[in-house]
Swiss-Prot record:
Chief site of localization: cytoplasm
The organism's taxonomic lineage, starting at the top: Eukaryota, Fungi, Fungi incertae sedis, Microsporidia, Unikaryonidae
Function recorded in the entry: Signal-recognition-particle assembly has a crucial role in targeting secretory proteins to the rough endoplasmic reticulum membrane. It must be involved intimately in the translocation of a wide variety of protein substrates.
Residue ranges of the region described as Disordered: 90-115
Family indicated by similarity: Belongs to the SRP19 family.
Protein name: Signal recognition particle SEC65 subunit
């Protein structure tokens, strides 16, 4: 029995990710780092019926929550292209720039991070790992 819905996680539309990291669609129709509330606003603006599940998490993007179940009758690519265009329009409007506190803090500063177990971890405090002392013979 085939489902009447398809699932959409924000990671599926993230142009900053590779296919092996979880992106599902072409980079040309994706947006860089889409957030849950941006996708929700875009779906409401496009008047597409959806069910949002804010507590659901994608296994490869565990720190960002949110999933949408959208009816297949709209067409997957049509929905993805519409959402990405709407998000781009919302981001380009002056005065509606919604930056997270992390983006505001990192503006003008060089924030470095490390990839651990496939997850990027920011080093906000610029902590440095202690070097091991060499044993004397």
């Amino acid at each position: 029995m085939e489902s009447k819905h398809f699932c959409l996680y924000p990671i599926y539309m993230d142009s900053a990710r590779s296919l092996s990291e979880g992106r599902k669609y072409r980079k040309e129709i994706c947006v860089q780092r889409p957030r849950y509330h941006e996708i929700k606003n875009a779906l409401e603006k496009l008047e597409i019926e959806y069910t949002d599940e804010p507590s659901k998490k994608h296994p490869r993007d565990f720190f960002n929550s949110g999933r949408f179940r959208i009816k297949k009758e709209y067409g997957r690519l049509f929905v993805i292209e519409g959402i990405s265009q709407t998000i781009a329009e919302l981001r380009s409007k002056p005065g509606s720039s919604e930056e997270t506190s992390r983006e505001k803090q990192s503006r003008g500063k060089a924030v470095h991070g490390v990839v651990q177990n496939g997850v990027y971890v920011e080093n906000k405090l610029n902590l440095v790992r202690k070097k091991k002392a060499k044993k004397k013979k």
